[in-house]
UniProtKB/Swiss-Prot annotation:
Function as written in the Swiss-Prot or TrEMBL entry: Catalyzes the reversible phosphorylation of UMP to UDP.
Lineage per the UniProt record: Bacteria, Bacillati, Bacillota, Bacilli, Lactobacillales
Name of the protein described by the UniProt record: Uridylate kinase
List of residues binding ATP: 11-14, 54, 58, 162, 168, 171
Subcellular location: Cytoplasm
Activity regulation behaviour: Allosterically activated by GTP. Inhibited by UTP.
Keyword ATP-binding: yes
Family: Belongs to the UMP kinase family.
Catalytic activity: UMP + ATP = UDP + ADP
Amino acid sequence: MEPKYQRILIKLSGEALAGEKGAGIDIPTVQAIAKEIAEVHVSGVQIALVIGGGNLWRGEPAADAGMDRVQADYTGMLGTVMNALVMADSLQHYGVDTRVQTAIPMQNVAEPYIRGRALRHLEKNRIVVFGAGIGSPYFSTDTTAALRAAEIEADAILMAKNGVDGVYNADPKKDANAVKFDELTHGEVIKRGLKIMDATASTLSMDNDIDLVVFNMNEAGNIQRVVFGEHIGTTVSNKVCD
């Protein structure tokens, strides 16, 4: 069976790395995620990763508490690099050649982000983990994921959610009548104000015709199911599938 997508970017929340601890980094949890990604990688799919930093730091609350917003955001970018390094180490543990590239140069721990080099790594079947956001404050890791996916010409962004199995018209934890969408267009997401990604990230995905698949990463095997075309979660594209 052939994969539906040949090149993907997986977007993980920082909280996904915290496991049941809720904050920080839980190494067994990271290793479990890395194992699942490695199993997909064996099929020949080219994989890049963007990981948030919310398990270690959140810039907006820090800014609300009086910290300079720019400094708060830069602090968050460093958190994403920590997550990237830990994930890369776990992927290496499973025999996957992995590179970390950061938007802020820190040559002692990672490569600088260079698009051509990232593409060569992918073509050589290496996983690339992008850290430090886009290197500028005020931009989320969702926007980073959409931008890097466009730059590496990914077929899809896999939004691996922590316990959320798709996109709903209301919060299913608060509304028992919430309805899950199987398919949406990027335009519908923006028009309805659905908070899958921020508006900048949604527009980037729409303009570059990148599919977005939102699914529950807590169920083992779901990344592979998405890659091989099994319809789980919610698929967002420029054209709703038949």
